[in-house]
Amino acid sequence: IDSAIERGKIAITSNPAELARSGRVDVVIDATGNPDIGAAFALDAIANGKHVVMLNVEADITIGRHLHEAARRAGVVYTGAAGDEPAATLELIGFAQSLGLEIVCAGKGKNNPLKFDAVPAEYEEEAHLRNMNPRMLVEFVDGSKTMIEMVAIANCTGLVPDVPGMHGPAATREQLAEVLIPKEHGGVLSKKGCVDYSIGKGVAPGVFCIVTTDHPRMQERLIDLKVGK
């Protein structure tokens, strides 16, 4: 690997340990989607002084806190990857918090029709047409992937599911701020500070962050800018 890099070439290897121990590599990205492989590779990379970008949300929700601490002790960075729903949601949350707004609920729109009892055998043809593994496709359909991504957001922010499995209402983009809010205000939540998802039209494949504030001037500006009421 080092020789290829020094010659300006692209190196391909079947041994991740070689990548983790390369003297010419500063940052590694894990996009395997396999928690076992991701955890082992990240630990090896961190032990060898590499920064780790974890595009493997399955590994991140399982052992991410440990990897983050291991990276801190080693003086390197462990981080998620921008672009996917958890990171995009975190960007909204961070922006809202920087404005002094209180987070009511944050999450994503589910991309696929929700079918809790979906099994790979039922989706082999569709998976073939979409060039996907049937098992992975079913993870998107049965809600597993959505649950995993919400755990990633919860681990990073301290926001929590309001109920096991979350509510997952069929709220449209325009209805989100009327549904995923506390019951005392006409919504479905028992408290503020939650993660959840919607299967309503106009939300997927996007993310959302519902906020509130007690500050009169901020309330006035949100209403004036037509982003709140």
Where are these regions (language model features)?
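Conserved active-site and cofactor/substrate-binding residues in soluble primary-metabolism enzymes
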Residues: S14, G23, I37, T62, ...
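Rossmann-fold NAD(P)-binding glycine/threonine-rich loop
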Residues: T32-N48, L55-D84, L90, G94
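N-terminal glycine-/serine-/threonine-rich beta1-alpha1-beta2 phosphate-ribose binding loop
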Residues: I1-D44, N48
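Rossmann-like NAD(P)H-binding beta-loop-alpha module
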Residues: A71-R72, T79-K145
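Solvent-exposed alpha-helices and their adjacent loops that cap or buttress functional pockets
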Residues: S3-E6, L19-S22, G38, A96, ...
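Short glycine/serine/threonine/alanine-rich loop segments
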Residues: K50, G75-V76, L101, L159
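C-terminal catalytic/substrate-binding lobe primarily of soluble NAD(P)-dependent oxidoreductases
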Residues: E125-K229
